[in-house]
Amino acid sequence: GHKLGEFAPTRTFRGHKKEDKKVKR
């Protein structure tokens, strides 16, 4: 996973929709 997705959920769910659940928990 990408830890930077925590403070950058915008590019996270935008680049990885599968990790969207990880960011939003």
Swiss-Prot record:
Q: Where is this region: Disordered?
A: 1-25
InterPro entries, per this entry?
Ribosomal_uS19_SF
Keyword match NADP: no
Q: Which GO terms describe its molecular function?
A: rRNA binding; structural constituent of ribosome
The UniProt record lists the keyword Disulfide bond = no
Gene Ontology cellular-component annotations = ribonucleoprotein complex; ribosome
Q: Name one GO biological process term.
A: translation
Keywords (alphabetical) are:
Ribonucleoprotein, Ribosomal protein, RNA-binding, rRNA-binding
Family per similarity comment? Belongs to the universal ribosomal protein uS19 family.
Q: What does this protein do?
A: Protein S19 forms a complex with S13 that binds strongly to the 16S ribosomal RNA.
Q: Provide the protein name.
A: Small ribosomal subunit protein uS19
UniProt source species: Acholeplasma laidlawii
- What is this organism's lineage? Bacteria, Bacillati, Mycoplasmatota, Mollicutes, Acholeplasmatales
